[in-house]
């Protein structure tokens, strides 16, 4: 099963059609916040999150960073129409938009087959991850609130 998060209806529609034609079950989210709510309530298996990097409320970058801390085994594939803006950060595999059926399916298969996700973090990410775990740490009575984790992430100073 794949979770596809994008604020563009047309991208979700096309992505769903391409993925379903390849045999994938697809959940859709209109932005990162909705994706977090879906992830927080999902009880079944999820193989991959595909997320637009630039979305309102919670961006795909924030979604990927929170998942790299709290669900490190879950692969994330970023999609964007602004490829030049993300070339400096190579921790997340990126598929440029617009994509073809072939390029999407190839990226999905690579991500799932190779367990591609945010690569091992650099020191800054480790510091942020440690602080994020402290702020949003779960207990036996309270599971991780992924939405609160993004809010905490936004409050963590960089550097």
Where are these regions (language model features)?
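Charged docking surfaces used in two-component/phosphorelay signaling
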Residues: 13-21
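Acidic, metal-coordinating helix/loop segments flanking the phosphotransfer/catalytic sites
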Residues: 28-48
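Acidic catalytic/metal-coordinating carboxylates
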Residues: 30-34, 58-63
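Active-site residues of response regulator receiver
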Residues: 52
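Receiver (REC) domain active-site loop signature in two-component systems and cognate sites
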Residues: 55
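Hydrophobic/aromatic residues positioned on beta-strands within the core alpha/beta folds
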Residues: 77-80
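C-terminal output helix
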Residues: 99-112, 119-121
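CheY-like receiver
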Residues: 114-159
């Amino acid at each position: 099963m794949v979770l596809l998060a994008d604020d563009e209806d047309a991208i979700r529609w096309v992505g769903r059609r391409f993925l379903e034609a390849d045999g994938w079950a697809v959940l859709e989210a209109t932005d990162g916040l909705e994706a977090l709510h879906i992830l927080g309530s999902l009880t079944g298996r999820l193989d991959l999150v595909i997320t637009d990097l630039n979305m309102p409320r919670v961006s795909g970058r924030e979604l990927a960073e929170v998942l790299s801390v709290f669900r490190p085994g879950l692969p994330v594939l970023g999609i964007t129409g602004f490829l030049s803006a993300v070339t400096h950060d190579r921790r997340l595999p990126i598929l440029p938009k617009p994509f073809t059926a072939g390029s999407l399916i190839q990226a999905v298969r690579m991500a799932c087959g190779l367990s591609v996700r945010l690569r091992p973090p650099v020191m800054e990410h480790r510091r942020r991850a440690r602080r994020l775990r402290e702020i949003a740490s779960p207990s036996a009575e309270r599971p991780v609130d992924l939405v609160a984790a993004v809010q905490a992430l936004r409050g963590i100073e960089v550097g």
